[in-house]
């Protein structure tokens, strides 16, 4: 391996967006290195193939910067984890992840504004992007699987790290929704393609917005502090989110592929649900007490089958963190045509990053998105009990959750009802047929989502484990 490849083999597993944590890296091979700026600080768009000891291969996009002198030292001092390796000699200096260098983010923006072609990379610009904006790109700290650069609180460039063949769903779906006239999501203003993959997408940035998770957990705190026992003041927002979700599903059904009523694939669905349940019970034996009851719900949902006959593209990773409350004046995605102000917008259409691209594109019941949001309400209600994500930090016990059950259940139920009322009313208005047995299917999807959460928390956030376990008990009507 070259010096860069050897260094990347050590560097990549340390990054938060690296998907192969826990796997042994056998080799890294640079497939492409396209110079985007040759003067210092220089920038190259690198695509590296990571081969694992177990035989798998993944491809990663790494913007690689190089600089020397005082500014280089200042960068490495404040972001030492961005350094890939150091070069020696009079022209030496750090080789680093350029997403951490605000000076170099503007190189991507300039190439997009000019719709440039640089070797095998293609930079596309939508005609709706009319404003001229230059300057540094500020890296958002909250990203997990990608890296996002914000320019002037107006634009956001999402750089995809783990690459898969074909068009990224974030680009595919938002472009289709924009074409269908759905304005409650960030329309693409430009994108980067190379080596058969989408490397990045430029979208409007909603400055001053607040995500649904933050807003909901603030309302939960208000609820627990109130003396009258009222379930907080999030229900109006929950109803608005329900209506928005139905509008989103209607737009996706119009703009993207769908399966007509009468073509269910319930056998595959039931097999997947039961397969995941078996896997999670082996990991968390505490779930074994509810296994029979969960299987009964799955069996009844398969036998009824009504709601699953409507299959279409869905969001696929839908929860309170994927919706933003946009303040007055925030976000002008088409250079002067602002989105509707003071309402919710939906973001992040990639689907669950851990799932293969083919699976994320698979047609599914829109009720899976509904189930995801309902489970998010459950998490928000119990979030104040969670002390942290450190595996060494003890989380709430089952008894502690039981003591919170009354006020938490009141908040959950109020917002579930508001969301579902909003969703079903708007879905009915738009002619979306959910089927007469949608409640049974929704319950099965909620249980499946909670079972997945049990597996995730057991592996990654043990202090949170009792939250999905408690959610399963509530869905089954089992006492806390």
Regions found by a protein language model. Give the residues of each.
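Actinobacteria-biased recognition of intrinsically disordered, low-complexity terminal regions
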Residues: 1, 329-336, 477-480
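Active-site catalytic-loop/activation-segment of kinase and kinase-like phosphoryl-transfer enzymes
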Residues: 260-299, 410-428, 455
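Conserved ATP-binding subdomain of kinase catalytic cores across diverse folds
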Residues: 43-278, 328, 342-343, 347-409, ...
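Flexible, glycine/threonine-enriched loop-and-boundary segments that flank and lead into catalytic domains
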Residues: 129-143, 284-329, 335-361, 431, ...
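Short Lys/Arg-enriched alpha/beta "domain-start" segment
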Residues: 1-27
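C-terminal amphipathic alpha-helical interaction region
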Residues: 279-288, 309-314, 342-349, 357, ...
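Short amphipathic beta-strand and strand-loop transition segments with alternating hydrophobic
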Residues: 24-39, 47-49, 299-302
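ATP/Mg2+ or Mg2+-diphosphate-binding catalytic cores
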Residues: 399-436, 440-480
